[in-house]
Amino acid sequence: MKLEIPFDEEGIFLERKTRFTGIVSVGKERTQAHIHNTGRLPLLSPGKRVLLKRAKSERRKTKWDLLAVEYREEFVFVHSGYHSLVAERILGEMFPGARIEREKTSGNSVLDFLVDGKTFVEVKGCTFEENGVAMFPDAPTVRGKRHVEELIRCVESGFRALLLILVFLESRCFLPNRKVDPFFSEIFWHALSKGVDVCVFRLKYDGEYLHSMGNLPICEEV
């Protein structure tokens, strides 16, 4: 999978003004950038280089969208608005020729995809790691737990269910973040035992393209 998402300008991150608004420096200008991500994003700290995309509408309060932030030796893609497009491309490779439908209702939840009317898919993006282990979530997620519970119900109803995790930074394996959200961690392992499939994909952003770097294993629980 290779998806073109070029950035327009490089800047310096100054501060997170609100959950979805950051202050950045672009050249000599101090301006606002939209942070399209509901996580805490601990890697987004003052002084970090960031890659920005110009907002399509001139009427918007924030002039820029924040695409990626410098972390160690790479730029980590943090714009969750692209997750569905990335996942759709990956699913197209996993299920060649399949009918892929977005946002399908199952029970009281809306899951991200339904493949060929048989496989429900929920997508989660991961931008946090600790000691080389990618972890989700980086903040408690009641909604994420509910989605995994619905995937379990899908399996119990005769469907196939897939939790697709997109990891955007260098890691050797993946674990649910028990320290941050023990309830999500518990339901994650329960889902595996109930037959929910989990696929973890590592993605790398080079400023022009988002590349799929292959699968990551699930670590032994620590």
Curated annotation (Swiss-Prot):
GO MF annotation terms: DNA binding
Coiled-coil features, chain-numbered ranges: none
InterPro entries per record: SfsA, SfsA_C, SfsA_N
Domain of life: Bacteria
NCBIfam families per record: sfsA (TIGR00230)
Family recorded in the similarity comment: Belongs to the SfsA family.
Cited HAMAP family: SfsA
The name this protein goes by in its record: Sugar fermentation stimulation protein homolog
Protein species of origin: Thermotoga neapolitana (strain ATCC 49049 / DSM 4359 / NBRC 107923 / NS-E)
Gene name per UniProt: sfsA
